[in-house]
Swiss-Prot record:
Keywords: Antibiotic, Antimicrobial, Bacteriocin, Plasmid, Secreted. Kills Lactococci by dissipating the membrane potential of the cells. One of its GO terms (cellular component) is extracellular region. Residues 1-21 form a propeptide. It comes from Lactococcus lactis subsp. cremoris (Streptococcus cremoris). This is Bacteriocin lactococcin-B.
Length: 68
C-alpha cells in the first residue's frame, strides 16, 4: 500500500538533527521504553515491542517457571 499522506519516516538520530536535541534512554517496562528529549526536557514513551509478542512472552515465561 502506498503512503498516501506523504509522511517521512525518520530515525531518532535524524530527528535529533532536525530538532536540535536527542532522545536519551531512561527505562523500559513491559512493551514500552521511555526516553528523555534533551532539547525540550519532555519524557517520551514509545511502544518498542508489539503487545501480542510481549503478552505471549510473559505467558511462556510463566509456564516455563511453573513446570520446571
Amino acid at each position: 500500500m502506498k503512503n498516501q499522506l506523504n509522511f517521512n519516516i525518520v530515525s531518532d538520530e535524524e530527528l535529533a538533527e532536525v530538532n536540535g536535541g536527542s532522545l536519551q534512554y531512561v527505562m523500559s517496562a513491559g512493551p514500552y521504553t521511555w526516553y528523555k528529549d534533551t532539547r525540550t526536557g519532555k519524557t517520551i514513551c514509545k511502544q518498542t515491542i508489539d503487545t501480542a509478542s510481549y503478552t505471549f512472552g510473559v505467558m511462556a515465561e510463566g509456564w516455563g517457571k511453573t513446570f520446571h
